[in-house]
Amino acid sequence: MQVFVLIYFHMKKRKTKLRSHCPVNYGLESFGDRWALLILRDIIFRGKKTYGEFLKSEEGFATNILASRLNHLIDVGILKREPDEKDGRKDVYTLTEKGLDLIPLIFEMVLWSAKYDDQSEAQRITPLVELIRNDNRRISKKVIEQVRRGEGIVKDYLS
């Protein structure tokens, strides 16, 4: 048993070793995967919290990919998992402080997409896009508080 634990720990540690300490690489290895970013989007914009809610995302998560990305985001300290107070059979996923600090970056991605994707759904949240464009830092602080309370933000900014 002790040998297995040591091997498992070593494998886990090796798996998360960074390829370099370039700041861009660190971000990519932490959260720069399509599926990881969609999980962050669902928490921030839609207020999703459970595995089942993430599974219903329109992009169609495969169960193994979803489980893998949730575990990775927990391992790198972006998400935390706790038992649901209302239903102990479920887990609730929330952003840590490290995860909340990604909100301004996610907002910059929204601006970039709104600029270059003619069919961007950012058109549905024009008020939010304008707030981000005018003062990302201020709106990010407000949104961080909403997300801390477990609220999705899209409903507040639909055009």
Give the location of each predicted region.
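C-terminal regulatory/oligomerization modules of transcriptional regulators
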Residues: M1-H10, P104-S159
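N-terminal helix-turn-helix DNA-binding core of bacterial DNA-binding proteins
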Residues: C22-A62
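Residues within the helices of the helix-turn-helix
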Residues: G52, N71, D91
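Canonical helix-turn-helix DNA-binding module
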Residues: E58-D84, G88
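Basic, amphipathic "hinge/linker" alpha-helix immediately C-terminal to the N-terminal HTH DNA-binding motif
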Residues: G32, E85-E108
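N-terminal leader segment of winged-helix/HTH proteins
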Residues: M1-F31
